[in-house]
Amino acid sequence: MKLIVSVMPRSLEEAQALDDTRYLDADIIEWRADYLPKEAILQVAPAIFEKFAGRELVFTLRTRSEGGEIDLSPEEYIHLIKEVAQLYQPDYIDFEYYSYKDVFEEMLDFPNLVLSYHNFQETPENMMEILSELTILNPKLVKVAVMAHTEQDVLDLMNYTRGFKTLNPEQEYVTISMGKVGKVSRITADVTGSSWSFASLDEVSAPGQISLASMKKIREILDEA
């Protein structure tokens, strides 16, 4: 289980002021570029990629329809992703498949996609169909984050993930039940078949996130013989 921490600068000055040494315990850095105005993203990108040079990095534009901070037309979304991908070659590129399905074909040349689905309202009843459709597309990683309201919501997603991972052992997954009741899903990734778990440093990027320090301790305990 790799631990992912998001950086969410709201300006070039904030990006330049990031202390990269505080993120040494994170296995992967996620740059949530949606906290910037869309016209500032390409201006801030050099500072982010220089700051975290040599680290695994996920480039994410989380749009408002999936719980993020930015609204983008399909043309704007694809343009920004392609520009960052071609200029900086991030290790992973998050792509909101269900929000931008109509332009997905333009991303087929990119082998490092994280095909993602986020639902901040509920754990939908068609989770198996969602996981199946994303798996068939054979991305670098399938990511699903949904809001849990009951313990059963959490257990259902865990069972679906374990089942899909068993049937598709070469495919990487990260599935998250958001909210307080879903916190357990963040610490059982290895059991359910998730490759990543998201943790927070100063500011959470999703409901129910656990601090990086706590997640590191939990991982150490789980790794004990």
UniProtKB/Swiss-Prot annotation:
Segment forming the signal sequence: none
Subunit relationships: Homodimer.
Keyword 4Fe-4S listed: no
Binding-site residues for 3-dehydroquinate, renumbered to this chain: 6, 30-32, 62, 186, 205, 209
Enzyme Commission number, as recorded: 4.2.1.10
Source organism (scientific name): Streptococcus pneumoniae (strain P1031)
Protein's UniProt name: 3-dehydroquinate dehydratase
Chain's role: Involved in the third step of the chorismate pathway, which leads to the biosynthesis of aromatic amino acids. Catalyzes the cis-dehydration of 3-dehydroquinate (DHQ) and introduces the first double bond of the aromatic ring to yield 3-dehydroshikimate.
Record-linked InterPro entries: Aldolase_TIM (IPR013785), DHquinase_I (IPR001381), Type-I_3-dehydroquinase (IPR050146)
Alphabetized SUPFAM superfamilies for the sequence: Aldolase
Gene Ontology molecular function: any one: 3-dehydroquinate dehydratase activity
Pathway participation: Metabolic intermediate biosynthesis; chorismate biosynthesis; chorismate from D-erythrose 4-phosphate and phosphoenolpyruvate: step 3/7
Matching HAMAP family: AroD
Enzyme class of the recorded protein, top EC level: lyase
